Amino acid sequence: MSNTNGGSVGKCPVMHGGQTSTDKSVMDWWPNALNLDILHQHDSKTNPFGPDFNYKEELKKLDVDALKQDLKDLMTNSQVWWPADWGHYGGLMIRMAWHAAGSYRIADGRGGAATGNQRFAPLNSWPDNANLDKARRLLWPIKRKYGNKLSWADLIILAGNMAYESMGFKTFGFGFGREDIWHPEKDTYWGSEQEWLAPSGAKNSRYSGERDLENPLAAVMMGLIYVNPEGVDGNPDPLKTAQDMRVTFARMAMNDEETVALTAGGHTVGKCHGNGDAANLGPDPEGADVHEQGLGWMNHKTRGIGRDTVTSGLEGAWTTHPTQWDNGYFYLLFKYDWELKKSPAGAWQWEPIDIEEQDKPVDVEDGSKRYNPIMTDADMALKMDPEYRKISERFQQDPAYFEDMFARAWFKLTHRDMGPKSCYLGPDVPSEDLIWQDPTPAGKTDYNVDLVKGKIEASGLSIADLVATAWDSARTYRGSDRRGGANGARIRLAPQKDWQGNEPERLSRVLAVLESIAAEEGCSVADAIVLAGNVGIELAARAAGHDVSVPFAPGRGDASQDMTDVESFEVLEPVADGFRNWLKKDYVVKPEELLLDRAQLMGLTAPEMTVLIGGLRVLGSNYGGSKDGVFTDRVGTLSNDFFVNLTDMAYTWKPAGENQYEIRDRKTDQVKWTATRVDLVFGSNSILRSYAEVYAQDDNQEKFIHDFVAAWTKVMNADRFDLQ
């Protein structure tokens, strides 16, 4: 639209009936309110595809060989608007894929490359992701060509693989299957700092104590993927940087050997860019004006491309031949002594002393010119930290071993958040099962389900035992990286069998019964555990006067201890479970916020979370048999009593200690029930109360049971990727 009013500026033409910009939201006015938005993401209202779209089916139409060739051709098809270094985009594409996958953290499974989230804020505008918008824009013609048959998430990682292969490296494999999201994720906590690259001593720092990094964060600074390339807080000291690397990579699920392999393999090709003044760069993509069309960090003051590009501020390549895979990284690292210098952009970097001319990489535009290679503080850590040095020396002496280790580490980095191997699609999925994939064998489906259910019902186990055991087995599932869940029955293995939240003594007693039944009838223990929960619910519904059959799909397998990486599974241990009204200890975070986080990881909506809480309470499935929140006089009956009594104004609610409340009769002042914050939030939060009122209605008792069974089944089947 053009302004036809002589250039004068008028007042806003709308009466602010809709909030279209960033004026104060409800959460801004009441910042301590429970943010239920994290449960309502990525639904049909933001997804341009209809409910019938199936990415798995679209992938079957993809010509993978043609796609891979197109990507290899792209690598050397330099564009005038963003020229390729040495005529090859490989380094840029690898950095894009690395930074997409490298945002993953093992503590909550969030981040990573499985959703294509690098296209959206904040990741698309992180300082560490500067100029990766150019990489994605270079890929756009390929995305446009293959359309619905290829997600951005898959394309970003495959581009990294093909970049390596086009430079002579053989990758370990590739699995398709990453599905795109369509807006920024609202559930991922990136840190509480108020500025990019805030040092560790700044306000709201992610560090406490000596240098204790806040959970679940992995990166050392807001806006970085892993560590600061100049050193801790920008101060070069390779030994201190080594400690940051060890923490950061461990939180990305990598050990020391994988850390060295990824650092060296990532820096074998490509370069850093800092040949100019960063002050000449424009805003990041989210802050740029509309005419930039989603591109950021544009330099309209100087040339700003090719050899004059500014990205990280460091300037130079790590190796003599930055467009080919070789062992040149370790060759230069150990051949020369290195000294600190400043890049043209003013960043700290390490440069070799008295380097031979033939060891210098050539200029990205003029092959007759040579410049010093560089190392970051992280690179120098591989030489100066004793443990990293041992690994680096072995890699230098055995290039084939290094190549294999890097191939495996790169595959792990780029597939860690995709879930089990059954989620990998396409012709290049490696046949080898890897321990970090949480392998689980297929289970049987040809046994008599009704006979198993009958034996469980006759076993003497209580409804609470049946329901709690099934819930504990399934609740570990997290949609963020598709780990955990009931399949595999790892609740009977270390470390889960000993987790406090699983009530080990009760669990052992119940499992002994279920394992015996499973052995007698030829089903997996995993199936028997889920069936036990279903039986408990059916019995409780029958007690309420409703004949219900809880849906069940056989086929879960039983993992072995050898298939289970104990250390890797320890991060799945719940520290709280509001569904069973349990806290391992008191936390700064409110119990209801911990509940919300758990519900989001499990893939639940707010109504599903609500109905599950109400049902689990009346089934008596609280941790340790606690009576908190059990607002019923008929425990074990699947009734809507929790909601009826929570919303009944015949009662008052009074604090009775830390996270403890009493529900008293208004007339007699007698204590009727006790509760926690998790219970009362369903009456205090206006949104949750609206759901509670629905289930409290006289005409919705049957709806309550129906919705509870549906939500329960969703939880039990969350990790059944074979059914999806």
UniProtKB/Swiss-Prot annotation:
Domain of life the protein comes from: Bacteria
Cross-link (Tryptophyl-tyrosyl-methioninium (Tyr-Met) (with W-98)): 226-252
Heme found in the keyword field: yes
PTM field: Formation of the three residue Trp-Tyr-Met cross-link is important for the catalase, but not the peroxidase activity of the enzyme.
GO biological process terms held by the UniProt record: cellular response to hydrogen peroxide; hydrogen peroxide catabolic process
Cross-link entry Tryptophyl-tyrosyl-methioninium (Trp-Tyr) (with M-252), positions: 98-226
GO CC annotation: cytosol
Record flagged with keyword Transmembrane helix: no
InterPro entries assigned: Catalase_peroxidase, Haem_peroxidase, Haem_peroxidase_sf, Peroxidases_AS
Required cofactor(s): heme b
Swiss-Prot/TrEMBL keywords: Heme, Hydrogen peroxide, Iron, Metal-binding, Oxidoreductase, Peroxidase
Active site, UniProt feature: 99
Catalytic activity: H2O2 + AH2 = A + 2 H2O; 2 H2O2 = O2 + 2 H2O
Family affiliation: Belongs to the peroxidase family. Peroxidase/catalase subfamily.
Entry function: Bifunctional enzyme with both catalase and broad-spectrum peroxidase activity.
Assembly: Homodimer or homotetramer.
Protein name: Catalase-peroxidase 2
Source organism of the structure: Vibrio parahaemolyticus serotype O3:K6 (strain RIMD 2210633)
Organismal lineage: Bacteria, Pseudomonadati, Pseudomonadota, Gammaproteobacteria, Vibrionales
